Amino acid sequence: MPSMDIVSETDLEEVRNAVDNANREITTRFDFRGVEASFEWKKPNIILKAEGDFQLKQMCDLLRSQLAKRNVDAKAMAVGDASASGRNWSQQVTFKEGIEQDMAKQLVKLIKGEKLKVQAAIQGEQVRVTGKKRDELQAVMQLVRTAELEQSFQFTNFKD
């Protein structure tokens, strides 16, 4: 009986590479000349530091574009509130790992709502989907990809 797992993982090595590339790009950008701005990689978080709120927003967009180049979904990125201390601003970015219980329930409800001949079960931080045919699992994969959920999902452990 074919089965697969739906998980939500982020490749932290690719995130680190994106942070390094973003730091390099900031040093060469004209709008950041003479400004103290940096990305700090504190696994699994990133701390953005700049002299102004507007620059933090630009840095966040820059980070998103670098993540997209490295094939890391920006939905996995959770941006915190900007905080000021003196003349410096900082903002923390975290990455969602695993599927929370509420999201897993929403995912199972979505799959069962399509009336496909599959069973979906929550197993910790992942959702196991089993069906009689491989085509049904592929239909579930397509359904999850097209659904407007605020988290990115990957499909692993595909067994025939």
Swiss-Prot record:
- Sorted alphabetically, which keywords does the UniProt record give? Nucleotide-binding
**Cited Pfam families:** DUF520
GO MF: nucleotide binding
Keyword field contains Nucleotide-binding? yes
What GO terms fall under cellular component here?
A: cytosol
UniProt record similarity statement:
Belongs to the YajQ family.
Q: Which HAMAP family match?
A: YajQ
Q: What is this protein called?
A: Nucleotide-binding protein CPS_1098
Species: Colwellia psychrerythraea (strain 34H / ATCC BAA-681) (Vibrio psychroerythus)
